């Protein structure tokens, strides 16, 4: 049996649980729990997605979050030599995120959530600092906004923008 192109692509994707949250509702018979999960999906080569889902069972929330993340996949075009071409500062709600390119061998210098996103995107050398809100969803959205807003080096050179080497 041969595999279709889509199933082959999905096999390469790595899925990580970023945050799991449990909520409880007090009802007549006791407490009723529900779960929410924030899931990251990436291939380490520039394809990245995130998904958020809720369910009454933890495994269902994780499964639904993974499906949502695969539907939300995006390609980060501006990656080069394991880093980003320029510095970027992004705001999303209360979260701010600063990403700076780093020299080869530096590694990923970032907090745990942002580090996981950058690793799954395939970035090897970068310095990141988050300010403001540490709400996981806001940090993830800020990171995706920063990564999708990057301009490739050739576009910057064509415009005549200054680039630090």
Curated annotation (Swiss-Prot):
List the record's Gene Ontology CC terms alphabetically.
small ribosomal subunit
| Gene Ontology biological-process entries | translation
The S5 DRBM domain, residue ranges: 13-76
Instruction: Write one Gene Ontology MF term.
Output: rRNA binding
What SUPFAM superfamilies has UniProt attached to this entry?
A: dsRNA-binding domain-like (SSF54768), Ribosomal protein S5 domain 2-like (SSF54211)
Presence of keyword Flavoprotein: no
- Tell me the keywords, alphabetical order: Ribonucleoprotein, Ribosomal protein, RNA-binding, rRNA-binding
The record describes the protein's role as: With S4 and S12 plays an important role in translational accuracy.
NCBIfam families on file: rpsE_bact
What PANTHER family would the database entry show?
MITOCHONDRIAL RIBOSOMAL PROTEIN S5
Q: How does it assemble?
A: Part of the 30S ribosomal subunit. Contacts proteins S4 and S8.
The domain section of the record reads: The N-terminal domain interacts with the head of the 30S subunit; the C-terminal domain interacts with the body and contacts protein S4. The interaction surface between S4 and S5 is involved in control of translational fidelity.
State the family it belongs to. Belongs to the universal ribosomal protein uS5 family.
What is the protein's name according to its record?
A: Small ribosomal subunit protein uS5
From which source organism is this entry?
Chlamydia pneumoniae
Gene name on record? rpsE
């Amino acid at each position: 049996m041969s595999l279709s192109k889509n199933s082959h692509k999905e096999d390469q994707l790595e899925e990580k649980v970023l945050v799991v949250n449990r909520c409880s509702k007090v009802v007549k018979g006791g407490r009723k729990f529900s779960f929410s999960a924030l899931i990251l999906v990436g291939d380490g080569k520039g394809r990245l997605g995130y998904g958020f889902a809720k369910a009454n069972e933890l495994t269902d929330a994780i499964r639904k979050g993974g499906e949502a993340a695969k539907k939300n996949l995006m390609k980060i075009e501006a990656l080069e030599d394991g880093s980003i071409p320029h510095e970027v500062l992004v705001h999303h709600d209360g979260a701010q995120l600063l990403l700076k390119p780093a020299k080869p061998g530096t590694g990923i210098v970032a907090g745990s959530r942002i580090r996981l996103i950058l690793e799954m995107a395939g970035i090897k050398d970068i310095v990141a600092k988050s300010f403001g809100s540490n709400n996981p969803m806001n940090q993830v959205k800020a990171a995706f906004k920063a990564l999708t807003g990057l301009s490739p080096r050739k576009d910057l050179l064509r415009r005549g923008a200054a680039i630090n080497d």
